[in-house]
Structure formats: structure tokens, C-alpha cells
């Protein structure tokens, strides 16, 4: 678009826009933020606002769109949610006093990863992630700008990087190196991330001091540089950098967490129906965030787990005190977010009042915790800093009825500042003085309807109608003439008016200065406030887990070093909550020291997947320190959980169900140790029957012989149950059924041994398929069951056909032709017992080429 004959104001816009080409520029002009040129056209479509033009009569009018400054945040939120950046340019001087073009500067760049203010506040974290690469390992740092949380780690490969980004649910990733086109596609198209780039490392190392690798230091430094560059201010609320290792937590991929519905239901993408939903009896926003973090990252340290358990047990044993604690926590606001608003210079009077109300609750919370009289709880008590001096400052300084905005006045309490009280007295008494003057002049002049009015142009004046002009005293002076009246002033009235105007102006200015001073004082307490926030969040999560344990009759799990799993009458905690205790059928799970694999058979809808998820959730709950849904639980400490439960194509990256299965299986067998838990449901169903069966067997054997992880493998391939005769650490279990008078009842109970039938047609019957179709399926099943297992049935004609007709519909693999001989030789050369699953898959594909 041609940009000729540009006015000075528009030239200023273009100069600023040049520095922010990848962002929408909101350009403050009076009471509006304006957008121009391409920004205006695009924003009008995205925000559904009017598109107009500047200099409409010009040859090339400039597209323009705008939003009111007081409601701009909701429009910014929309753009950020859509994955865009927004640069906010403010007027840096009073337009009335400006000479020439009003000075404007960008004061903040808001991006999906740096949101602090929002018209729709969310208690969840919003992480900005930075990734760097040194040619060998990846450094990954993340920060929540709204809370100050700041962490860093290093990772071995891009798959781990991708998984960690997904686990953090980041919306923006900052890169300090060039990604391959494939990796960019994964991040942008598959994970819907905004990619930003930063090459400069933040110079001040004070925030990133510590024992870090070079690549970790670089990632953290570039993250800091980007945040300072976009926020354009010192961020006093940023917390000390925390180094963490993935191995210090129970490792789970994003796919595993999703399949287990840990923080949201995978089908609805809502919190309801997730483990997070079940366990959330928190009372604070900080507690909600910490609970989610505990679910995301269960512990592997037995000592740390037992410490949490002990406090939960203490809370469970003291119902009255715990109830008082929960009620007190309801009065605690989001200290972390309030601290960040103070740091950003955006805290308003309501924010400080919320901080004050929170601090007023802290002594009560501390006293309740002391009343538990427990050494483990005393550690929390000792970490609680009540900050009484800050609470006193806010309570005595800020009026409890103060408005949300600073400009409205009435912020500071009466009695806090003598000068402010004086000005307020002048304004308050000035109204009485004016009433006295009005009464006096009415009596002395004899003008019965004489009154004093006010407007911005003339100030205070006497209103005299034309019929009374002859009675106007000599000391009155004319201020304005109207059609039917005159406006007059007096020296006395002018003096009072001057005093009142001075008091109003001085009061407004002084009150603003006092508030700024108080906010600056609050900022000096940010580090102590953040430590208090962490302690209160921990207390909140622990009381939440105690409430959930009591409500749902959970028990305290035990841990062993013998690699034994014992779960008596265990329940899937979330399913039980949804169904109700009376409806749910519990199942025991047992792995002795020798057993590493349970091969579970049984029909769909019978409860195999629920059984596997039950074990995973029990492990996760136990290792996050929670009590669990069972009569008795004794577990080893797991280092990782790998799952493949439920079929799902990866449509965005174009990967089929089978490919996704193989990739997840690959991750499991490569990364799992003998301290891991593997849960595979119907692995191999995404390909031809024999391909799938061969791969399933090869994977089972590989896990058995080389990995040694505790594994539950659910399958419809009943032939695999024979593996128990040669794999000493594999046992068969099945879902029990009851057959009576041709009807089948799924008992949803796990029993020893293999299933004798799959009951697929019965499941179809439950699903309501037509009777004629079910009858035909019975015929086909009967015929198939009479055939040799080595023969793949391509089609089975209805009713009874000759055996020759059947053979005509079969594919012969072992005929006398030359190609069949070649295939037979290839098959005989395969060493099945020593093949990896992926060697098996490759071999099968090569065999297919020979057909």
C-alpha cells in the first residue's frame, strides 16, 4: 500500500510500527487505541469491529479501526488467544501541553506467553518456554510471567523437548537456534504454538546464577532477555531460577497424561471427569495451580512422598481443625498474581485491599496449623511469614470502599495523611461556605430567587434573572450574559472557589502520590509474599487431598523395595466418583516379584481398559502423596509410566493409528526400565491380523526379556495366551463373564487364566445392531472357527457352501509356485525370539512386497 503524503502523526505511527512488524500496534489517540493500514484491515475481521479510513477523500485513504481505551483489554485478549502479539503505544505526555505531535512510545508487547492482565482471569499457569541447543543437548527454560515462576532443565532429544512443552501446555515457544522444517511443522501446526526468536542472552546473571550447564544458562538467559524486552520494566516479582531434572519425577508423556485424563477429560477437553477435577477441593487459586503441578509431576522420592502422606493423615485425624483451616483459606486471594501486578505497576486499590484481606487471614491460618500439634505440620507453620507490618500499612492506608481505578479518588483512608485530610475538609466545608454566602447575599440584595450554580466554564456564579437586574449589588461583577438572565461573581465567592479548586487539585495529586508510595512499599515485600504464597498453596493442596480422602474413603498406600504390586479391591477413582460407590465394581491387582507381565484377554466393554487405568491412577495418586481408592495398596516406586490406551489417529501430522501405536511402543521399549509401568491396550490392531499378532508377540517378548518393566498387555489375539508356557514372568488374566440361557453378562471382575471367548457378537448385540446382521455374524463365526488358524479367511459365503468354494476365496501363502517358495524361505530364516518389534514390522513389510 502506498504511504505518500503522510502527516507527522502517521509518520510517527509508521516509525513505531517498523520496530514491531510481527505485532498488532495499538496506537493511543485520545480515548481510543487506533490501528492503521494492514493491522486495521486484519483486526477488523478478527475482532468484528468497524473498518473505516483516515483522510477519506485522499487518493489513498488509510484503513483505520479502533477500540475504546477503557475496554481495550477484552480485544487484546481475543488477539492473544488467536496466537498474535500486540504492541501497546501510549501517549507519553499531556496532549494539551504537547508541542507538535504528542510523544508516543510502546510500553509493553503482549504475547501469548507473557499475558499478565486479562479481562477473563484464569487461575491456571501460562508458561512461556525457551529452548536452546548446543549440538548435543537441549536447554529448556520456562516462566509464568503472571506468577514469577522460573525453571530450567536440560533434555537429551527433541522428542523429550516436545513432550515437556506439551506437559507445560505452553502457547508460545522462544527459540535460540534454527529448527528443522519438520520440527517447526510439529510445533506450529501440530501443537498450535507461536514461535518467537531471541539471539541475545540477558546480561544480568544474578537471576540465573547457579550450577547450570551452558545450554541451560543460555536458554534461561534468552528467556529473560525476551521477557524484559517485551515487558519493558524491571520485574521484581520474578522468582529465583529453579533447576529441575525430569528424572526426579514420575515420567509421563503428554499422550500418557491425556489417555489417563489427568488434568482434563480427553473427550471433552474439560476439567470435569479428570483426576484434577476429582482431587480439587482447594480454596485458593495458588492451591489449584500447585495441585495441577503435583498431578503432572508425581514424586519418585519415598521420603518426600511420606512427608506429604503424614500431613494428610494429621489433617484427616482432626476434622474440626481441618474444617476451620478450609474456611480460613477461602479468604486468601491469589498472592502470586497480586504480587506480579504490583511489580508491573498495575496494582489498583482493589488489588491492595485483597492483599490486605489475605494477610489479615494469615495469623488465623497459622494458629489453626499450630493447633494440630504435629512436628510435620510445624514445618509449614515455621514457613509462614504473617507480614504484620504490611497488613497494618494496607489496612490503615487504603479505604475499604476504594474504587478499582486510581483516578476516581477516595482511595486513602481519612486519618492517614494530615495534608490530604485538610484538603478534603476544605472541599467538604467549602460547600457549606457557599451555601452561607448564597443565603447572606439573598437577604442583603432582596433577590428572593438568587442562587449559586456551577459549571466548568464559569465556575461558581450567582444566577440573576432579567427581572431582578435592578437589585444586583455593586460588588457583583458580570461573568456571562444569557437571553433571560445574567451570571455574576463576587470577590468572596471567587476566593472560596479558588480554595475549593486548589483543594480538589491538590487532593487528587496528593492522593495519587500517596498511593504510588504505598504501592512502592508493597513491592519491597514481594519476595516474602511469594514465599508465603508457596506455603499457603502447599497447605491448601494437602487439606484438599485430606478432604477427598475422607469423602471417598481412600486409604494410605505403602511402598516396598521388592518390586511387588498388591492392590486389594482397588477402584478407578474417577469412574467411581462419576458412577457412585454402589455402582462401581472393584478389582484387585497383584504382581509378585517374579511376575512382570499380565496378559489380559476379554471382550470390549468388559473393563480391561478401566483395569489398566485403575492401576495407573493408583500409582500416580500414591506417588503424588495422595491417599488412594482401595482397601489396601503396597507398591514399588515407579520411575515412568508408558501407555497406549485407546485408538487415535494423529490427523494433523498425517499419522495413522498404527503408526502412532508403533511410535508410542517405541518410546516405551526404548525408555522404560525395570522400574517402569507399561500399559498397552490392543496393540497391533491398526494393521492386518497376522502383522498385528506378530508385532504384539514380539513386543511382549522384548519387554519380558530385555526391559523387565511391570506391564499389562490387553489383547484380542487369544493365540498370545500360549506365551505363558514359555515366558516365565508372564501370567494370563481375563475379564470374567457369566453365560446363562444364551445371554452373557460381563462381571467386570478380573480372574486368573485366559478368556475362552471374545464375545464380540454379544457386544454388537448390546450396541443394538440388527438381528439379521447378528445372525449372519454367527454363521460367519461358526465357519471361521472350523478353519485352520494358519489360513486367513478373505470371505465366508452365507449358509453352507462346498469346501472348494471356500478355498477359492482364500489366499494361498504356501502353494507350489516359485514366489511361495521364496516367501517360505524368508519366513524360515526369521529368528523371532531375537527380533525387536520394529525389525519384525520391517520384515513383514518386506514379505508383503514379495506377494
Curated annotation (Swiss-Prot):
Instruction: Provide the Gene Ontology terms for cellular component.
Output: cytosol
Family matches, as PROSITE patterns? DNA_MISMATCH_REPAIR_2
What's any GO biological process attached to this entry?
mismatch repair
Q: Which InterPro entries match?
A: DNA_mismatch_repair_MutS, DNA_mismatch_repair_MutS-lik_N, DNA_mismatch_repair_MutS/MSH, DNA_mismatch_repair_MutS_C, DNA_mismatch_repair_MutS_clamp, DNA_mismatch_repair_MutS_core, DNA_mismatch_repair_MutS_N, DNA_mismatch_repair_MutS_sf
Which residues does ATP bind?
602-609
The reply to whether Ligase figures as a keyword in the UniProt entry is no
Q: Which Pfam families match?
A: MutS_I (PF01624), MutS_II (PF05188), MutS_III (PF05192), MutS_IV (PF05190), MutS_V (PF00488)
Is this entry keyworded Repressor?
no
* Cited Gene3D superfamilies: 1.10.1420.10, DNA repair protein MutS, domain I (3.40.1170.10), MutS, connector domain (3.30.420.110), P-loop containing nucleotide triphosphate hydrolases (3.40.50.300)
- Enumerate the UniProt keywords alphabetically: ATP-binding, DNA damage, DNA repair, DNA-binding, Nucleotide-binding
SUPFAM superfamilies reported in the protein's UniProt record: DNA repair protein MutS, domain I, DNA repair protein MutS, domain II, DNA repair protein MutS, domain III, P-loop containing nucleoside triphosphate hydrolases
GO MF annotations for this entry?
ATP binding; ATP-dependent DNA damage sensor activity; damaged DNA binding; mismatched DNA binding
Function of this protein? This protein is involved in the repair of mismatches in DNA. It is possible that it carries out the mismatch recognition step. This protein has a weak ATPase activity.
* Family affiliation: Belongs to the DNA mismatch repair MutS family.
- What's the protein name? DNA mismatch repair protein MutS
Q: Which source organism does the UniProt entry give?
A: Streptococcus pyogenes serotype M12 (strain MGAS2096)
Gene from which the chain derives: mutS
Amino acid at each position: 500500500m502506498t504511504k505518500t503524503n503522510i502527516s507527522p502523526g502517521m509518520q510517527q505511527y509508521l516509525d513505531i510500527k517498523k520496530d514491531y512488524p510481527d505485532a498488532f500496534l495499538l496506537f493511543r489517540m485520545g480515548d481510543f487505541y487506533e490501528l492503521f493500514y494492514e493491522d486495521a484491515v486484519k483486526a477488523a475481521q478478527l475482532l468484528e469491529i468497524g473498518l473505516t479510513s483516515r483522510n477519506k477523500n485522499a487518493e489513498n485513504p488509510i484503513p483505520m479501526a479502533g477500540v475504546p481505551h477503557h475496554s481495550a483489554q477484552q480485544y487484546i485478549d481475543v488477539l492473544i488467544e488467536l496466537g498474535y502479539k500486540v504492541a501497546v503505544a501510549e501517549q507519553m505526555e499531556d496532549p494539551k501541553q504537547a508541542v507538535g505531535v504528542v510523544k508516543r512510545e510502546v510500553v509493553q508487547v503482549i504475547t501469548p506467553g507473557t499475558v499478565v492482565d486479562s479481562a477473563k482471569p484464569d487461575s491456571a499457569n501460562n508458561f512461556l518456554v525457551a529452548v536452546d541447543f548446543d549440538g548435543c543437548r537441549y536447554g529448556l527454560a520456562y516462566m509464568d510471567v503472571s506468577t514469577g515462576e522460573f525453571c530450567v532443565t536440560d533434555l537429551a532429544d527433541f522428542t523429550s523437548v516436545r513432550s515437556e512443552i506439551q506437559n507445560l501446555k505452553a502457547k508460545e515457544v522462544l527459540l535460540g537456534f534454527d529448527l528443522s522444517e519438520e520440527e517447526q511443522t510439529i510445533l506450529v501446526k501440530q501443537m498450535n504454538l507461536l514461535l518467537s526468536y531471541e539471539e541475545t542472552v540477558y546480561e544480568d546473571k544474578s537471576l540465573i546464577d547457579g550450577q547450570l550447564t551452558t545450554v541451560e544458562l543460555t536458554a534461561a538467559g534468552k528467556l529473560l532477555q525476551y521477557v524484559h524486552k517485551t515487558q519493558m520494566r524491571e520485574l521484581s516479582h520474578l522468582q529465583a531460577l529453579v533447576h529441575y531434572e525430569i528424572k526426579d519425577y514420575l515420567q509421563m508423556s503428554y499422550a500418557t497424561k491425556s489417555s489417563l485424563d489427568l488434568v482434563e477429560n480427553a473427550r471433552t477437553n474439560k476439567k470435569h471427569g479428570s483426576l484434577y477435577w476429582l482431587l480439587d477441593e482447594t480454596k485458593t487459586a495458588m492451591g489449584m495451580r500447585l495441585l495441577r503441578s503435583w498431578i503432572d509431576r508425581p514424586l519418585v522420592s519415598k521420603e518426600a512422598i511420606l512427608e506429604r502422606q503424614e500431613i494428610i493423615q494429621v489433617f484427616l485425624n482432626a476434622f474440626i481443625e481441618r474444617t476451620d483451616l478450609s474456611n480460613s483459606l477461602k479468604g486468601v486471594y491469589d498472592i502470586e498474581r497480586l504480587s506480579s501486578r504490583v511489580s508491573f505497576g498495575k496494582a489498583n486499590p482493589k488489588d491492595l485491599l485483597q492483599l490486605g484481606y489475605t494477610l489479615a487471614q494469615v495469623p488465623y491460618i497459622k494458629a489453626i496449623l499450630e493447633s494440630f500439634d504435629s512436628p510435620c505440620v510445624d514445618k509449614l507453620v515455621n514457613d509462614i511469614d504473617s507480614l504484620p507490618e504490611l497488613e497494618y500499612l494496607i489496612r490503615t492506608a487504603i479505604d475499604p470502599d476504594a474504587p478499582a481505578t486510581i483516578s476516581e479518588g477516595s482511595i486513602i483512608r481519612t486519618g492517614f495523611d494530615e495534608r490530604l485530610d485538610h484538603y478534603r475538609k476544605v472541599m467538604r466545608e467549602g460547600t457549606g461556605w457557599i451555601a452561607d454566602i448564597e443565603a447572606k447575599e439573598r437577604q442583603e440584595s432582596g433577590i428572593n430567587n438568587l442562587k449559586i450554580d456551577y459549571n466548568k466554564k464559569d465556575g461558581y456564579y450567582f444566577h440573576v434573572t432579567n427581572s431582578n437586574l435592578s437589585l444586583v449589588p455593586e460588588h457583583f461583577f458580570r461573568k456571562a450574559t444569557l437571553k433571560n438572565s445574567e451570571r455574576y461573581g463576587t470577590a468572596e465567592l471567587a476566593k472560596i472557589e479558588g480554595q475549593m479548586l486548589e483543594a480538589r487539585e491538590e487532593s487528587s495529586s496528593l492522593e495519587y502520590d500517596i498511593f504510588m508510595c504505598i504501592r512502592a512499599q508493597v513491592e519491597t515485600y514481594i519476595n516474602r509474599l511469594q514465599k508465603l504464597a508457596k506455603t499457603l498453596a502447599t497447605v491448601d493442596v494437602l487439606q484438599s487431598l485430606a478432604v477427598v480422602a475422607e469423602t471417598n474413603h481412600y486409604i494410605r498406600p505403602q511402598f516396598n523395595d521388592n518390586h511387588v504390586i498388591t492392590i486389594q479391591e482397588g477402584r478407578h477413582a474417577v469412574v467411581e466418583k462419576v458412577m457412585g460407590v454402589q455402582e462401581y465394581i472393584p478389582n484387585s491387582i497383584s504382581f509378585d516379584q517374579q511376575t512382570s507381565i499380565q496378559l489380559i484377554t476379554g471382550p470390549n466393554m468388559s473393563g480391561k481398559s478401566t483395569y489398566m487405568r485403575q492401576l495407573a491412577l493408583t500409582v500416580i495418586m500414591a506417588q503424588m502423596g495422595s491417599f488412594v481408592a482401595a482397601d489396601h495398596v503396597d507398591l514399588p516406586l515407579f520411575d515412568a509410566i508408558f501407555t497406549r490406551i485407546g485408538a487415535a489417529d494423529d490427523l494433523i501430522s498425517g499419522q495413522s493409528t498404527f503408526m502412532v501405536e508403533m511410535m508410542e511402543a517405541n518410546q516405551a521399549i526404548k525408555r522404560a526400565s525395570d522400574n517402569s509401568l507399561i500399559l498397552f491396550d490392543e496393540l497391533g490392531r491398526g494393521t492386518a491380523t497376522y502383522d498385528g499378532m506378530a508385532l504384539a508377540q514380539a513386543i511382549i517378548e522384548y519387554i519380558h526379556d530385555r526391559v523387565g518393566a511391570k506391564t499389562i498387555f490387553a489383547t484380542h489375539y487369544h493365540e498370545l495366551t500360549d506365551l505363558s508356557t514359555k515366558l516365565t514372568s508372564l501370567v494370563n488374566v481375563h475379564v470374567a463373564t457369566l453365560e446363562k440361557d444364551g445371554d452373557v453378562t460381563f462381571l467386570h471382575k478380573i480372574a486368573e487364566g485366559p478368556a475362552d471367548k471374545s464375545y464380540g457378537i454379544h457386544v454388537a448385540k448390546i450396541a443394538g445392531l440388527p438381528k439379521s446382521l447378528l445372525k449372519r455374524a454367527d454363521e460367519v463365526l461358526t465357519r471361521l472357527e472350523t478353519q485352520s488358524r494358519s489360513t486367513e479367511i478373505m470371505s465366508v459365503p452365507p449358509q453352507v457352501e462346498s469346501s472348494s468354494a471356500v478355498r477359492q476365496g482364500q489366499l494361498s501363502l504356501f502353494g507350489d509356485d516359485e514366489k511361495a517358495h521364496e516367501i517360505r524361505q524368508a519366513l524360515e530364516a526369521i529368528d523371532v525370539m531375537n527380533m525387536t518389534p520394529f525389525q519384525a514390522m520391517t520384515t513383514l513389510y518386506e514379505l508383503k512386497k514379495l506377494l
